Amino acid sequence: MQERYQPNSVEAAAQQTWQARDAYLVHEHAKNPDGSEKPKFYACSMLPYPSGKLHMGHVRNYTINDMMARQLRMRGYNVLMPMGWDAFGMPAENAAIKSKVPPAKWTYDNIAYMKKQMKAMGLAIDWSREMCACDPKYYKWNQWLFLKMLEKGIAYRKTQVVNWDPVDQTVLANEQVIDGRGWRSGAPVEKREIPGYYLRITDYAEELLDQVSTNLPGWPERVRLMQENWIGKSEGLRFAFPHRIAGADGKLIQDGKLYVFTTRADTIMGVTFCAVAPEHPLATHAAQSNPALAAFVEQCKLGGTTEAEMATREKEGMPTGLTVTHPLTGAEIDVWVGNYVLMTYGDGAVMGVPAHDERDFAFARKYGLPIRQVVALEGKTYSTDAWQEWYGDKQAGRTVNSGKYDGLAYQAAVDTIAADLAAQGLGEKQTTWRLRDWGISRQRYWGTPIPIIHCADCGPVPVPEQDLPVVLPDDLIPDGSGNPLAKNEAFLSCSCPRCGKPARRETDTMDTFVDSSWYFMRYTSPDNDQAMVDARNDYWMPMDQYIGGIEHAVLHLLYARFWTKVMRDLGLLNFDEPFTKLLCQGMVLNHIYSRKTPQGGIEYFWPEEVDNVYDAKGAIVGAKLQRDGSEVNYGGVGTMSKSKNNGVDPQSLIDTLGADTARLFVMFASPPEQTLEWSDSGVEGANRFLRRLWALGYAQREAVGRGLATGADWAQAPAPVKELRREVYGLLKQADYDYQRIQYNTVVSACMKMLNAIDDAPLPEGPAADAARAETLGLLLRVLYPVVPHITWHLWQDLGYAEHLGDLLDAPWPHVDEAALVADEIELMLQVNGKLRGSIRVAAKAPKEDIERIAAAQEEVARFLEGRPPKRVIVVPGKLVNVVG
């Protein structure tokens, strides 16, 4: 055994041994030595995009997964921890444009490097199950399931107003528009009408919503709430404003009815205007004879189509000059075009009730529209000068200024008004959803080809199943001028499967969220080229623990739930939800330093380029560049980012201090679900702990060897030996509890305390002490092994544990020796007349009389009672004794 800890050689030796043994190769229905079947546990991290290098967020995510997998394997579980690559997507195309190499080469080069990094981290991954989204063997099943959904009517083609990213030249789902900008390019999103394929996720809205509360108890409450809000169930009234507006053909537009949906039918008597979406037929009709309105409509199309954007965009409108009729009063209601109205939600029109809707209130105040109060609260005075929250209270109010409906509470008003509108054939109660069908068509090259052939005679024709996969050419180099598939005759040209005539392939590819909606099931059946999944999927799924960022709460997780339910309904699996438990790890943060450039931009600096300036309390209040002493702005801490120069390269850390140091720091610095602030001193502290562990093993190697060979009679052991065992087993009990709670930072804390206890224990020479050293250090190595597997495995080998107890890879999780936790003696606080004066040690099972006698005989008692005899002695078992005099 070498005297000094050398992480590079230690980690290389361990990894070579594990790889030679296929240590993490997993099979279904694994057996215990007695022939019984091991329980399964499937723990999986969200698959990474192969961007080129791992970042610290990856290191944290995968270390959490690895700790869980290793510890549960020690507990006797058959544990699956796989890995794959979310390899399709726009970054590969953008990189190809820049470097003039095919996206396939860029992607596979990145995968090779990142896989090497993962292996250097010592992750317990079963690489035999590796999948890659851009592999035809994988995306064949995207295409196959799409065709099955097409057969069932779950997939369909339509033309719709969509979010168009003008930079990436593709359609974005609502969830991919952030603050009106494309989630990847950051470009302002436009509205366009374009044909594409959609999946009827709305058919599953009720089940998706219901099972958030019934089937996902192991998910964070925050994520469940985000899913509930995104699905967005609303129960209300859909009704019509009649009109006599005819189109160019002389027919009434939309049969003479402007439909709206509202959850506040009790306020219908307060309608003073209606607003329609820029794409609404009434807006189109009015714009034909109104150039100003036509220009406004075009301006509205420059924005995105999400509710989130509508909530933040300034509300603007323009009157159409058209009117509709109030269905209950007969009054003429002006129709406006509003930039905040979505054609894709409901009927593309809303009623305006300024008195009781904050958005309508602001709109009416801006454009001088009437505001009519129709709900009042007792003791409250209504004013049109400023919005007050009670204006929108639907539970406490009563209707006013509403004719026959005056004096009604919310539900009574809704029911009465709904009945009256239904009697006229103008309305009915209805449930609506925020959730929209999932548009999966993307006008990009690097994605799963949509298996459709377009024939001039037959129209869109599905590719026959036997012709799958439709293989994506992997040698094209995009030039930024649209989809290269549309210019590639070898891909485009084909024959119609139905009539045999020349035809053209669909050039749109699938949204990459299709790839990530079921990859975790392909891990279970990776080598099956005849079926999407097989019986092995039934063994492993549902997944026991999923690990990934909160940023995927709506996008990926909702799509994965939907995809699972579709596969279930197609008879491919027999469960409802894919993920039993979900852990969303916190972001990794680091300090941000910047200053403005002469051109008005912002220049960011690496933390190692600056020296901090501290105040009297040690807080950072500024910073200076090391190279010239000039001041830079300190921006606090933020998520590690390439653009802000505050990332830390994991590979550099692994090369210098080792993977175990990186793993230990990211697990110790913060609970898994909370943010982690990077600290160079914390990293050094983690490395110092590992050096201490190695030094302890080296110093005690001979004693450990003797202890492993001889054993001990613990009942007869000296008191210091018993005390060490009691402390270490107490820490083991705490660590065991924290492992089960996934509180890995306190697991590491317990291990540090164990090391201190073992290192500092004043043990006498002898067999019992040697046995205690061997036992307690062995416990520490096993508890610490899931965190830092390389150093613990090496010490286990070098100190002789493997010879006596087997390889650490297969070592069982240690059991707490409850007898060791029972102390021979206990310490009681000693009080005199209720004031603390010291302590006494007594036998753990000493009778009350003995405790009273020992306490009364203490020198402190005699001194503070000034020689008076005690009047009585009060014993609080296990805590204190109070002598009263």
Curated annotation (Swiss-Prot):
Top-rank lineage group of the source organism: Bacteria
Keyword annotations: Aminoacyl-tRNA synthetase, ATP-binding, Cytoplasm, Ligase, Nucleotide-binding, Protein biosynthesis
Example of a GO MF term: aminoacyl-tRNA deacylase activity
Main localization, broad class: cytoplasm
Enzyme Commission (EC) number: 6.1.1.4
GO cellular component: cytosol
Motif ('HIGH' region): 48-58
Short motif ('KMSKS' region): ranges: 639-643
Known catalytic reactions: tRNA(Leu) + L-leucine + ATP = L-leucyl-tRNA(Leu) + AMP + diphosphate
GO BP field: leucyl-tRNA aminoacylation
Catalytic EC class: ligase
Location of the protein in the cell: Cytoplasm
Residues binding ATP, per UniProt: K642
Family assignment from sequence similarity: Belongs to the class-I aminoacyl-tRNA synthetase family.
Protein name, UniProt field: Leucine--tRNA ligase
Name of the encoding gene: leuS
